[in-house]
Amino acid sequence: MHPAHEGLSAMPFYDDFDLSTVDVLLISQYVYAHLACHGSWGSAHHWSRTMSAQRALAVQRLVYHYEWNIICILPLDFDDVPFPGAHQCIYHFGPFFLTPFLVVSPSNMLTSGSFHVDHAASLPYVLAKTNFKGRVFMTHPTKAIYKWLIQDSVRVGNMSSNSETKIQMYTEADHLNTYPMIESIDFYTTHTVSGVRITPYPAGHVLGAAMFLMEIAGLKILFTGDYSREDDRHLVSASVPPGVKIDVLITESTFGISMHTPRVEREAQLMKAITDVLNRGGRALLPVFALGRAQELLLILDEYWSKHPEVQKIPIYYNSSLARKCMQVYQTYVSAMNDNIKRLFAERMAEAEAAGDTGRRGAWDFKFVRSLKSLERFDDLGGCVMLASPGMMQSGTSRELLERWAPDPRNGVIITGYSVEGTMAKQIVHEPDQIPAIMTRASNAARRPGQRENEQTMIPRRCTVQEYSFAAHVDGKENMEFVQEVAAPVVVSSAPLHTHDEDARTNGVIDSGSR
């Protein structure tokens, strides 16, 4: 046992709870069954000497199955506490219920590892609707994008949910009113709250994503959250905190033991798939999340177009009003990105100055990508490449284009990220003969004479479908290498019940427990 465990009783919040009243095995099983998310709850008392090995392992499993790193979760209330679902954009704010064990102590601190909704979307609820009185930390880019992303999610949820089934967990006003409570912090800076020290380190994954090193009474715990170690065009990849002996490592295992195709090979396959569609006169649809991998894909496409004059007359469109707002954040935080994007930024500046054009010299000022404000302004004639959100194609622009383009065999859909079960993105990968029409215009066009009003309208699917993963998560090999580099005596890994790779569920993962 780590000697720091003995020091926990001296912590200011230690007397606020009684572990003997908590059935952590039941809690762990409930979380596994009901929460499809992949952040982390952390608590000083999880490592208490009062726990048996079995109970400690159960809590270790619990630690990695909620949306933030939170210090000191108190089992004081057994009423149902509703929290937003992990993927609200898909489920239209349908809630999961954490039952029956949580209220949050006023002495807590809260950190968000990234701006993605499955890590941050419950934050306005916690700040506006619970008794949480602690401090909240995000990196500067995470906080900047979080503001726009959650605001957009609330608006989309309000528009897409009918009044009979809608359960609104919080309002846009709740989000904006609690936003000033969030403190922006820099990577590599240490912050102390109630004797707990936290230090954020780059996690790769998306702009601003952070791993958090926590020190509790001398015990050092590293939460990776979602992280990536692959060299790409703009992110600083995750690395082991230098000069720190980690006692407990809590890491994601999104892809289990499966391994990514090498990056160069994946990019070549992606570009061949796109150009094959274009060469037959078709349109290539890439459904994407508005922020995250979409920016990496735009860099890949813009670079390829700049090197291949034969495709430069074919337009690349990016349709996302949210992304247009947030691209200024990407421009602002180029200094927080890797050397590849910094070099591109310097080259663009030099080119612009040489041409006397001071208006287009940012690394994110694309040469061949056009921002599309709405489909009303889209001249749908001839071949093109279209990156459109949402990534799951449950509704919105990507779904409307899918329904419009699916009947034409010249067109192609290319999936570039993970696909959630039950969504159109997951269904289309299996190449169904037909897809349901849910968008008004496509539905009306496909309606048969004499079809009943409530009868489901189906659209033939003749377009090609291909899938190439560019999800910014470590694969099994990268994760294992990171675990070995950290060399922590205790390693806790997310279980296969939540993984973006369905094959990993059957292939197995690094499981929770001690090395």
Label every PLM stretch briefly.
Residues 90, 222-224, 230, 252-261, ...:
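Acidic/glycine-enriched edge-of-secondary-structure segments
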Residues 1-111, 116-120, 124-296, 300-315, ...:
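His/Asp/Glu-rich metal-coordinating catalytic cores
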Residues 24, 221, 247-249, 283, ...:
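Structural motif
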Residues 25, 212-214, 226, 249-251, ...:
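Structural signal for hydrophobic/aromatic residues that build the beta-strand cores
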Residues 33-34, 98-99, 488-490, 497-500:
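Conserved tryptophan-centered aromatic signature that marks the ligand-binding surface of SH3
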Residues 9, 204-209, 216-247, 252-262, ...:
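Active-site-proximal loop/helix segments of hydrolase catalytic cores
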Residues 271-453, 477, 483-486, 494-495, ...:
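Hard-cation-handling environments
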Residues 3-10, 42-44, 51, 56, ...:
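Amphipathic alpha-helical heptad-repeat segments
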